[in-house]
């Protein structure tokens, strides 16, 4: 086999398939806080489907459950744990 054809052959590396984030026994519900909290960012935002690796139906159910939990006050709308310091930009820094 000449050198130009050898470049196109890929080595057969074994890879480990990732487990789905939601198992078949997991119940998507607004009361299941341990499940819901895995799909929320540090700022309290709902993570995208690409980041979560969920199917469309699962992402829709997770989104509805998160919104219900927010309305019922079991989950905050925003995570305000980080307090940002205001930095003045300009001539005078006090």
UniProtKB/Swiss-Prot annotation:
Top-rank lineage group of the source organism: Eukaryota
GO CC term, one of those recorded: ribonucleoprotein complex
One GO biological process term: translation
Keyword Plastid included in the entry's annotation: yes
Keywords tagged on the record: Chloroplast, Plastid, Ribonucleoprotein, Ribosomal protein, RNA-binding, rRNA-binding
Signal peptide per UniProt: none
GO-annotated molecular function: rRNA binding; structural constituent of ribosome
Localization terms from the record: Plastid, Chloroplast
The family this protein is said to belong to: Belongs to the bacterial ribosomal protein bS18 family.
Assembly with partners or alone: Part of the 30S ribosomal subunit.
Record protein name field: Small ribosomal subunit protein bS18c
Species: Manihot esculenta
Lineage: Eukaryota, Viridiplantae, Streptophyta, Embryophyta, Tracheophyta
């Amino acid at each position: 086999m000449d050198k130009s054809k050898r470049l196109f052959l890929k080595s057969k590396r074994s890879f480990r398939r990732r487990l789905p984030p939601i198992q078949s026994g997991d119940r998507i519900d607004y009361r299941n806080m341990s499940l819901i909290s895995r799909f929320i960012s540090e700022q309290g935002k709902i993570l995208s489907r690409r980041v979560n690796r969920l199917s469309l139906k699962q992402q829709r159910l997770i989104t509805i459950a998160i919104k219900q939990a927010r309305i019922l006050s079991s989950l905050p709308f925003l995570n305000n744990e980080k307090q940002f310091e205001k930095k003045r930009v300009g001539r005078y820094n006090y």
